[in-house]
């Protein structure tokens, strides 16, 4: 069925993206850390230049297809709630999104592939929903079936991002979709399970652990003590205040941001370069 193929393809795409991100990121960092033949200044310049180049490439791709910018989850939610945006769930947008995500994450920016994978999963589902009869195939198969398949694709995307089939189904049902049925649940669960299984199998083929939840940022098991609750609460309060201040500052500074296409690309490149100087 469509759900089977969607799950397999989403899992394969997620593996390919994460593998390429790992290769590019590792090459960028290891070249600086291990190449002692060049001076420290040369290595820093190389590090910043490559990071800025990756960011520039990613930002420039959005000029080809503007709907590929950002996480893309809002487009998926809009499509599943009756607001049609054919460009946002087109294969062109999906291809640009995949390439752009690989370069933006590899650049070292504080971004990840999780949101884009939801968008990409929905696009893959949309492609199967359209089928071989052209771009308006969903009008023949019915709006409800079209939404079901796109919902299943979005669920598979999130499931492959976090390694959680149930999480993908819950996200699609609670956050993305306004219309839900037992058939949608079965399709979404099948897609999500297959996507996670394929991703785990492909990771196992290159020597990574198969069948276990892996957190790249936590290699060792840690236990907290009761007396640490106080500092945890204080940290949460301070983080909330800091987050509110950052949000307010961003909203105030947004009016001064460059609105031209060249300006937006230059801004992303400059931000990446400045971040690299602090790493």
Model regions: which residues?
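Alpha-helical transmembrane segments and immediately membrane-proximal extracytoplasmic
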Residues: 1-279
